[in-house]
Amino acid sequence: MHKIVLLRHGESLWNQQKLFTGWTDVDLTEFGREQAREAGQKLKAAGLVFDLGFTSYLKRTKLTMELTLQAMGVDIPWRADWRLNERHYGNLQGLNKEQTAEQFGAEQVQLWRRSYDVRPPEISEDNQYNQKNDPKYQGIVVPSAESLADVVVRVVPFWQEVIEPLLRNNQRIIIVASGNSLRALIKYLDQMTPKEIIELEIPTGQPLIYELDDQLQPIKHYYL
C-alpha cells in the first residue's frame, strides 16, 4: 500500500479579501501560516514521514510547504512544478468576487467559478496580473484563462509522469497545491464526474491522506 498527502495551501491574503487569485503570486495571511504549522503538527502526530515534496510555482504553496515541514521538524527535498498552479482566472484575477457578481451578474460569475468547462474572460495584455512576461514561466505557454477541465489536462500528466513512478519506487510524497489543481487531481484519482468535482470543497491547510493499492488505485482517503 502507498500513501500520499495532498494539502491545500493555508489562507492567502486574497482568500481573505475575497479576490480572484489564480496565478497571481500572493502571500499567506498570518492565519494561513498558522494553518500550515498546524498541518505539520498533525502530520507529525500521525507518524507520517516523507521523502519528497512538490508545490506549484506560487509562493503561497511554497511557504505552506516550508512551514509544514518546519513544524514536523524535518528537512526533505521538494520542488516546484507549474502544472500544480491554481486555475488561471483570466481577467477576473485581482477582482473582488462580490463586486464582479454585481457587475456581470451572480449567475454568470457562478458559471465562471463553478462550471467544469467554461473559461472566464481571457486576461488582457496590459493587465497588471498577466504572468506572460514573468521570468519564472520562461519556456512555458502561460494560459490566458482556464476552466477546471483545462487544469485537469495539465495536472493528470504531472501525476502520471512524475508522481506515479515515484510511488512505484516506494517514495513517500507530500503535494502542496491550490484548490482547483487538487480538485483536478482528485477527479482523476477518484474517477469523479464533472458535476461531482465542481461541488467538491477542499479546505485550506487540512492534510488529505490518500491510501493507494499496488496499482495506485485509491483504497480510501481521509482528512487528519
PLM regions with names:
Residues 29, 33, 54, 58, ...:
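Amphipathic, non-transmembrane alpha-helical scaffold segments
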Residues 40-128, 187-211, 215:
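Phosphate-coordination/substrate-recognition cap region in phosphate-metabolizing enzymes
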Residues 121-147:
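Glycine-rich phosphate/pyrophosphate-binding loop
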Residues 3-9:
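Short, hydrophobic/glycine-enriched beta-strand segments
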